């Protein structure tokens, strides 16, 4: 069974992870989309048992993209559309519900490899996860009151 991928949405209706993904150059965006389609939707949280994932605690995990689209699709036996490019991306995620992976944020570690930058990005993802959980608990409470 495959996992569904959703983008975090803030109170203003913006989806910062989607905006970040769209801001990447075409080669990096293609690698990220391929990794999401080939790895994340198939493995979900189990991606943390591979080189592509790492548990960060408190419901947050890191999805690591180290290969370009051609390598990712090639490993899955799929045809690629482009030439090889260097890629080092991180996407922060949360697994919830019935096989849903929520994308909370991401950054290009190849451009900004410092631990400080990674720490800031993880904290942003944690803040978004807290906001998501608050909204979810509010929806459940409202649904119970309507019954």
Locations of regions flagged by a protein language model:
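Active-site beta-strand-loop-beta-strand hairpin of nuclease catalytic cores
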Residues: 95-103
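Short, surface-exposed beta-strand/loop micro-motifs that present aromatic residues
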Residues: 89-94
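Basic, Lys/Arg-enriched alpha-helical interface segments
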Residues: 1-87, 108-147
């Amino acid at each position: 069974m495959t996992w569904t991928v959703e983008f975090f949405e803030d109170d203003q209706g913006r989806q910062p992870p989607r905006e970040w993904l769209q801001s990447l150059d075409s080669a990096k965006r293609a690698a990220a989309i391929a990794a999401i389609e080939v790895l994340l939707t198939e493995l979900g949280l189990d991606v943390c048992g591979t080189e592509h994932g790492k548990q960060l605690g408190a419901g947050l995990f890191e999805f690591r993209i180290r290969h370009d689209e051609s390598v990712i699709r090639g490993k899955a036996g799929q045809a690629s559309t482009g030439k090889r490019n260097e890629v080092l991306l991180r996407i922060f995620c949360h697994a919830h519900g019935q096989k849903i992976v929520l994308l909370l944020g991401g950054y290009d570690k190849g451009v900004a490899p410092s631990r400080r930058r990674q720490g800031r990005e993880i904290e942003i993802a944690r803040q978004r996860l807290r906001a998501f959980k608050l909204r979810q608990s509010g929806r459940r409470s409202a649904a119970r009151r309507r019954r």
